[in-house]
């Protein structure tokens, strides 16, 4: 396991912060408060309004539309159909990613996280396009597709923000989790597959608990923000199978170790300890765990 974000303090609807990177956007410090730091009380008072989350409804609507198109295309068994829908999904994913950028900026500003990463939407848009393309090709017309698409679109932004700031808004984690669970429940009903739904929830809860225990033992590695995000990401993998869940535990940590080694050897910068955002590795590792053959790591 590798070091990652460490949540130094969480208030309701506050920001998940790094122990080594507490600096937030400049605020007016009170007596005894260091400049640039936001108190837990201040973060706790900043609660997003329901209107802040409206763009997520758009993400869900587009995800469902892509699923309907995929269900129709894969049902016709025409070779060109799935590829056309996957290409459409990629374009839709990129558009959705750009469309939710203002919401991401609002959530970051609300809890005093630097909003600068949200001004760079190209990489999240390209990453979301790739994930949506792959999700359509893998899931086809299965009803789990909207859940995967929605979780992917929102998680990519969480990873992007975490990469630059070593934190991301707790309201964003809650939005990803709630959206994923609701759409997952829809998939259980539509596909009449309670076994996959139960496996997804159990897998998410088990890995969440494992990460939490490890974070407590190591005093914050991985960070509690990553622990929270791991639940819905592992649940997404759990829908596929237990061997994929094992990959979802292994891959993020392997990728993170590789990332740290590359940074130390070729990065040309000195870091204090190991300071990096773990969410990007969680997202990439989750996608690979779904896409790769089950049990590939046993070969």
Task: Briefly describe each language-model feature range.
Residues 1-299:
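A membrane-topology feature that recognizes alpha-helical transmembrane segments
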């Amino acid at each position: 396991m590798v070091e990652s974000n460490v949540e130094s303090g969480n208030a309701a609807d506050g920001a998940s912060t790094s122990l080594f990177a507490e600096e937030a956007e400049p605020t007016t410090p009170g007596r005894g408060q260091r400049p640039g730091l936001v108190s837990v009380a201040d973060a706790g008072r900043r609660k997003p309004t329901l209107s802040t989350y409206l763009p997520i409804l758009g993400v869900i609507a587009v995800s469902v539309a892509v699923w309907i198109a995929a269900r129709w295309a894969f049902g016709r068994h025409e070779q060109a159909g799935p590829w056309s829908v996957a290409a459409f999904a990629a374009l839709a994913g990129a558009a959705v990613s750009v469309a939710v950028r203002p919401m991401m900026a609002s959530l970051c500003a609300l809890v005093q996280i630097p909003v600068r990463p949200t001004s760079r939407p190209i990489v999240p848009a390209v990453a979301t396009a790739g994930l949506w393309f792959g999700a359509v090709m893998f899931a086809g017309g299965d009803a789990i597709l909207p859940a995967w698409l929605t979780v992917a679109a929102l998680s990519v932004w969480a990873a992007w923000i975490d990469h630059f700031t070593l934190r991301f808004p707790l309201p964003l984690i809650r939005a990803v989790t709630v959206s994923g669970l609701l759409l997952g429940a829809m998939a259980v009903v539509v596909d009449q597959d309670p076994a996959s739904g139960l496996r997804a929830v159990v897998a998410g809860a088990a890995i969440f608990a494992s990460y939490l225990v490890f974070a407590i033992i190591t005093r914050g590695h991985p960070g509690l923000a990553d622990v929270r995000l791991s639940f819905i990401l592992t649940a997404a993998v759990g829908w596929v199978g237990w061997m994929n869940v094992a990959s979802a535990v292994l891959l993020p940590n392997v990728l993170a170790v590789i990332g740290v080694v590359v940074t130390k050897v070729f990065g040309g910068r000195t870091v204090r300890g190991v300071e990096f955002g773990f969410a990007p590795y969680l997202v990439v590792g989750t996608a690979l765990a779904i896409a790769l053959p089950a049990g590939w790591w046993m070969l």
